[in-house]
Amino acid sequence: MPFQSTVGDYQTVATLETFGFLPPMTQDEIYDQIAYIIAQGWSPLVEHVHPSNSMATYWSYWKLPFFGEKDLNVVVSELEACHRAYPDHHVRIVGYDAYTQSQGACFVVFEGR
């Protein structure tokens, strides 16, 4: 008699960053998260990578970190510019906390194809 497992066949799925397990965020929710990064005094940084390399390599910077940037629109426009330049790449924002020298927040804004 074959063994009947009561455990489901759960497949491991690669998730992307902080909000990877949640439903996709709306544009307003993304703006709120970026505003939070800025309000904390963290330096926004835009990174991108092709989906095939997202788990195996470091992500490439889009320009330099935006040290001291306080304008949400500047950060959003750079995210969109990176997405236009690399439409097939994942694009994420990192909020770098210089005090703790670590990432305060990091999440994917645009998923690549």
Curated annotation (Swiss-Prot):
The keyword Membrane is annotated on this UniProt entry = no
Q: How does it assemble?
A: Heterohexadecamer of 8 large and 8 small subunits.
Q: Which GO terms describe its cellular component?
A: carboxysome
The molecular function GO annotations come to: ribulose-bisphosphate carboxylase activity
Q: What is the lineage of its organism?
A: Bacteria, Bacillati, Cyanobacteriota, Cyanophyceae, Synechococcales
Name of protein = Ribulose bisphosphate carboxylase small subunit
Q: Where does this protein chiefly localize?
A: other
Q: What else is known?
A: The basic functional RuBisCO is composed of a large chain homodimer in a 'head-to-tail' conformation. In form I RuBisCO this homodimer is arranged in a barrel-like tetramer with the small subunits forming a tetrameric 'cap' on each end of the 'barrel'.
> Which family does the record assign?
Belongs to the RuBisCO small chain family.
Q: Where in the cell is it found?
A: Carboxysome
Q: What induces it?
A: Cells grown on urea as a nitrogen source have more enzyme activity than those grown on nitrate (at protein level). RuBisCO activity of urea- but not nitrate-grown cells decreases with rising temperature (from 25 to 28 degrees Celsius, present versus predicted future ocean temperatures); there is only one RuBisCO in this cyanobacterium.
Q: What is its biological role?
A: RuBisCO catalyzes two reactions: the carboxylation of D-ribulose 1,5-bisphosphate, the primary event in carbon dioxide fixation, as well as the oxidative fragmentation of the pentose substrate in the photorespiration process. Both reactions occur simultaneously and in competition at the same active site. Although the small subunit is not catalytic it is essential for maximal activity.
Q: Which Pfam families match?
A: RuBisCO_small
Keywords from the named record: Bacterial microcompartment, Calvin cycle, Carbon dioxide fixation, Carboxysome, Photorespiration, Photosynthesis
Sorted alphabetically, which InterPro entries does this protein's record hold? RuBisCO_ssu (IPR024681), RuBisCO_ssu_dom (IPR000894), RuBisCO_ssu_sf (IPR036385)
Q: Quick one: a GO biological-process term for this protein?
A: photorespiration
The superkingdom listed in its UniProt entry is Bacteria
